[in-house]
Amino acid sequence: MAITGVLGYSGRYIAAEAERRGWRVVGLTNSAGRLPNPAGYELRPMPWSTGENVLEGVDVLVNTYWVRFSYEGAGHAAFSHAEAVENTKLLFDSARRAGVGRVVHTSITQPDTASELPYFRGKAELEQALAATGLPHSILRPAILFGDTPEESILINNMAWSLRHLPAVATFGWGKYCMQPIHVQDFAELALDEAEKAEPACIINAVGPETYSFRDTWKMLAAAMGMWRPVLPVPAWLGYRAAQVLGTLVGDVMLTRDEIAGLSQDRLAVPGATIGTRRLSHWLREHADTLGRRYASELARRK
């Protein structure tokens, strides 16, 4: 089984679950030598980094590769959604040429080829590209991942960091739009269940068992941490400017315009069945003392 991002976040949990089930794991990464490999996985470069087909002999490909936002700032290599789309198409083509038996691909809730948001539009384009390969596949659509450590749960951890450092926090508008976070271990188990299926194609909304409005997430998080902060509704433009200022202070991109728009359009929640048993409300109580003690930087992960 080949897994992208095996040294990163969700890929690491998927790899560990695969080994528990008896799979031999091959990691696809461009971070060899930069990130630790304590499990000692065999590592191969991403297909777009080499002229070789790195998927030869692979039975199943699990893809978690993506970028959260496009970036062209100083101090880091540029990356973009457009580049991630093209790279992933090359990955799918490599899988097709190598005769990979099944692909499990990580998408997003409510992808849309007509969206003005590159994140959701790109994810929809990739779902179509995967289907066009003719390979048996499963498409998993998570909204937000959390667990197992606070630093790995960037959104939740940095909301907690804001509560610890700011006199008030904000929602964009009234904050009634919802999120359905799924624990990374539940997601890993789902990915392996799908890897071992024989269905030709399926799409699963990989959302957790609890649904919260953005406003209620602030309140629940503050309550778990034993503190109170006013939650102020602000216009999206003002919230973005505040995120820019805070991002400058911590040397990171805290939140983008597109992410605010995706939240406000209620794209991170879907009706229907949910996946997994691990609840964010329980996890917050277990990790309340350590949440937000340190800011979790997206850009630092990419150095």
Could you tell me what each predicted segment is?
Residues 97-102, 135:
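A short helix->loop->beta-strand "cap" motif at the edges of active sites that frequently abuts
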Residues 32-98, 109-113:
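NAD(P)H-binding glycine-rich loop region in Rossmannoid oxidoreductase-like domains
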Residues 38, 114-227:
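Oxidoreductase cofactor-interface core, primarily capturing Rossmann-like NAD(P)-dependent enzymes
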Residues 1-21:
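N-terminal Rossmann NAD(P)H-binding glycine-rich loop of SDR-like oxidoreductase domains
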Residues 190-256, 266-303:
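Mid/C-terminal beta-alpha module of Rossmann-like enzyme folds, strongest
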Residues 23-30:
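Conserved glycine-rich Rossmann-like NAD(P)H-binding loop of the short-chain dehydrogenase/reductase
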Residues 4, 28, 64, 103-109, ...:
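SDR active-site strand-loop-helix element
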